[in-house]
A protein has these predicted regions:
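N-terminal beta-loop-helix "entrance" segment that forms/cooperates
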Residues: 29-51, 108, 161-166
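Short, polar loop motifs at secondary-structure junctions
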Residues: 30-38, 97-103, 116, 135-137, ...
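Glycine/small-residue-rich loop that forms an oxyanion/phosphate-binding "nest" at active or ligand-binding sites
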Residues: 57-60, 64-116
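Glycine-rich, highly charged phosphate/nucleotide-binding loops
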Residues: 43-60, 170-178
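N-terminal basic/disordered segments at the start of proteins
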Residues: 3-22, 28-34
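C-terminal functional extensions of proteins
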Residues: 184-187, 196-199, 205-208, 216-251
């Protein structure tokens, strides 16, 4: 039995460790789009996507994959579409874990946006902004004003030159509130731009923003096709049931 984990998140790494411990005979393959850091998982690691293998369906066929569990970032929709299509074509199981969204708390000042363009354009009223949206393309950066002071925080260095008013901060979570408070104070940040990623790894910025009364421009999640599982324990139960009855298609 072989399970392909579409990873790149703390949840995915945790799932790999839990499944290895619970089902030691289950062979695990852990996929990441690119290596920010070598994942410490009890699995064969595949990086760089599946185009190099002729596509996901071809990879699953040649590697005899029996099931796919998608534990990528909540905003990673393309891989999810490919995985769902491949599992349907091949008649293998597919699960999608989607951690719960962050919810506003008392004292929060959130402004909600459906697209990154709308969010970035709305930042024009602020001189000093922290972007925690992941990679931002040159086209998207053009929505910002040249007289703004922007700090772009990502785990991976941008592949394109940044305008002079955009400063890059390399950082990999998890983050804590003390450090987030210090960052906001150091750069006199007036607004934070964030995706509603959910989870605890990057949630500290929201607490820091609440403390300093800094508004958060929150990018809402895209629609996810097909069924999802928000409870991690329930996902583990379903995977274990599948591993113990491999011939069944379990949804």
């Amino acid at each position: 039995m072989k399970l392909l984990i579409l990873g790149g998140t703390a949840d995915a790494r945790h799932l790999a460790k839990v499944m290895h411990q619970a089902q030691p005979s289950l062979e695990l393959v852990y996929s990441v789009a690119g290596l920010v850091r070598q994942p410490n998982v009890p699995a064969t690691v595949v990086s760089g996507g599946f185009t190099q293998f002729g596509g996901l369906s071809t990879y699953c066929t040649t590697q005899h994959i029996d099931g796919i569990v998608n534990v990528t970032h909540p905003f990673s929709t393309t891989m999810g579409d490919h995985a769902q299509q491949a599992s349907s074509e091949l008649g293998i199981n597919y699960w999608r874990f989607l951690r719960p969204t962050w919810q506003q708390k008392a004292g929060d000042d959130w402004r909600l946006f459906s697209t990154k363009e709308k969010l970035l354009r709305a930042l024009s009223g602020y001189e000093r902004a922290l972007l925690t949206l992941g990679q931002v393309s040159p086209k998207e950066l053009a929505f910002l004003k040249s007289d703004q002071h922007i700090w772009l925080r990502t785990a991976v260095q941008p592949t394109h030159p940044l305008p002079s008013h955009v400063n890059w901060i390399k950082a990999i979570g998890p983050f804590n509130e003390i450090c987030e408070l210090a960052l906001l104070k150091q750069h006199h940040i007036q607004v934070i731009a964030s995706k509603n990623s959910g989870g605890s790894a990057t949630e500290a910025k929201l607490s820091a923003a609440r403390t300093l009364k800094v508004p958060v421009f929150m990018l809402q999640r895209p629609d996810i096709k097909g069924p999802t599982e928000e409870n991690f324990g329930a996902l583990i139960d379903r995977l274990q049931a599948w591993a113990e009855t491999p011939m069944a298609v379990i949804t």
